[in-house]
Structures are given as C-alpha cells and as structure tokens.
A protein has these predicted regions:
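Metal-dependent phosphoesterase core characteristic of DEDDh/y 3'-5' exonuclease domains
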Residues: 40-48, 55-56, 92-195, 199-202
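Two-metal-ion RNase H-like nuclease active-site motif
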Residues: 24-33, 179
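Nucleic-acid-processing active sites and adjacent nucleic-acid-binding tracks
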Residues: 56-76
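N-terminal accessory regions of nucleic-acid-interacting proteins
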Residues: 1-23
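Low-complexity, Ser/Pro/Thr/Glu/Lys-rich regulatory segments of predominantly eukaryotic nuclear proteins
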Residues: 203-205, 239-263
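A short amphipathic alpha-helical interaction element
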Residues: 140, 207-225, 238-244
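Acidic beta-strand-to-loop metal/phosphate-binding motif
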Residues: 83-92
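A short, exposed loop/beta-hairpin motif centered on an aromatic-Gly-Thr core
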Residues: 58-63, 226-233
C-alpha cells in the first residue's frame, strides 16, 4: 500500500468556510477498475479535510488489488470522523462503490447527515454561468484552478495497469497526481455554489410554468401544506414530482425526498 499526505494552503475566506461548514466535510475521490461496483475494485482513494487554513489530503493506492480491503479500512477511519462528505459525481460512483466494498469486507462506514455531490449541485447552473461543459475541469477553470494533470479517469486506469506491470515511478506519480487533484478542487467548488445562491442564479433547466401550475394544483389537491422552492426544480425533477403526486398519496417528507434525489 502506498500512502501519501499533502498539506495545501487553503485560499477560501473564513466567512465562506463557516457559512457552508466546509471544515465539517470530508472530501474524497476514488479510482476504480470498472464502473460496476460489483465487478470492479477500488485501487486508489484521496481524502481531503480542512484544518485551520490548510487543506490536508491523504491518499492510499494499492500496489496489488488484493490490498483493497486494507484501503477500505484506512479510508473508513477518515470517513467516519465526519458527518458530511463531498464528491464530484459521487452519487453515481464513489458512494455506491464505498458502501458496496464496506459491506463486502465487513467494515463499517457510517451514513452521512449531509452528502454533497458537486456535479449534481452545479451542473443545472452551468449554462447560466456561461459554461459549455459540466466536467470537473470546466468548473475548476471557471474559478481559476489550473491543473498540472491532464489525464481523465480512463487514462488513469490504463496507466495503473502499466504501473502494476512496470513499477515505473513516473507512472505512479502521474496517477497519484490525478487522484489528488480531483480532491484538491472540491472545497473550492463551493465558491460557485456560494455565488449561485447569493446572486440568485437560475437553473438552466428550470421547470416550465405549466409544470409549476400542475405541481401546485396537485399539492393543493392532496391537502399538503407545502410550497416547494420552484427556483431549484428542474424539468426532469418536475416530471418525477407530478408522476409521484398522481400515482400515490405523498407526505411532505416524501415530496422533499423526491426533490432531493433529483437534479
């Protein structure tokens, strides 16, 4: 198992750190052999957290895929220190993978009070922000973060396979850099979230007036004492809400869950 620890100066105002409780969050990113968590393995993980004005990143990389259990054990120690975590597209990959592997090896990883998938949080506002893409690199560039690394996830997987055969130190350093840089930018992406909220930026895919009227009518019909924040509901989410309200009786909590799980 290869272990690295990096200390980086955190260039975020204390006010924003406190407003968004950024120092109460563990930030992480995994590298895997397959997108299917039942078939693949986690071979690298980077975990970041804030201490004072520093952003600390701890990183574990398997020199052999048989070390995956050890990687999960060490990661769990850090993940379980925090009530909240943040990822980029973690709802689709990192979270299910981590839980799948923790169950496989009998290692407890606690569910989180708050989970922030920055991909899902920021993507609906990309066009309103003038962005053509919703990639991590695109959001990084928007806030002035220039990467050293230029690889994508598929490149990294190929390079890892090369490393397993060659043990080339340069290849190793490149894949470690990619994984750590994927985590380094995560707290900074909250600056975009902060900007969106304080400037009342609208979603690019905001629900239509017709959908808004339909939801309002169905909520009243169901006798729910609830007014959704329509400024945060997409067309896709609106379709789910309308379907759910038509299909069955929903409580306010059920409706909030539908909204929360959509983006």
């Amino acid at each position: 198992m290869i272990y690295r620890k990096y200390e980086n100066k955190l260039d975020i105002e204390n006010k924003i750190i406190k407003e968004h409780a950024l120092d109460k969050i563990i930030y992480f990113d995994i590298e895997v052999t397959s997108l299917n968590s039942k078939l693949g393995s986690i071979w690298s993980i980077a975990l970041g957290y804030i201490e004072g004005k520093k952003f600390i990143i701890e990183q574990f990389l398997c020199e052999d895929l048989n070390e995956e259990k050890d990687l999960i054990e060490k990661s769990a120690e850090l993940l379980n220190r925090y009530d909240s975590w943040a990822t980029f597209n973690g709802k689709s990959l990192d979270e299910p993978y981590i839980f799948e592997k923790s169950i496989k090896y009998g290692i407890e990883i606690e569910g989180k009070k708050n989970t922030y998938d920055l991909y899902r949080m920021l993507t609906p506002y990309a066009k309103s922000l003038g962005l053509d893409q919703c990639s991590l690199k695109a959001f990084e560039k928007y806030i002035g973060i220039d990467r050293i690394d230029s690889m994508n996830g598929e490149d990294t997987k190929e390079q890892y396979n090369i490393y397993l055969k060659s043990r080339d130190v340069n290849v190793l350093e490149n894949i470690l850099l990619h994984n750590s840089e994927d985590v380094f930018s995560l707290p900074y992406l909250f600056l975009i979230k902060d900007y969106i909220e304080k400037n009342h930026i609208s979603r690019s895919d905001l629900l239509s007036q017709g959908q808004k009227f339909k939801i309002s009518t169905l909520i009243n019909k169901r006798g729910l004492n609830f007014k959704p924040d329509y400024s945060k509901i997409s067309k896709k989410c609106a379709k789910r809400i309308i379907y759910s309200l038509n299909a069955k009786d929903l409580s306010k909590e059920d409706l909030l869950k539908v909204i929360k799980e959509s983006y």
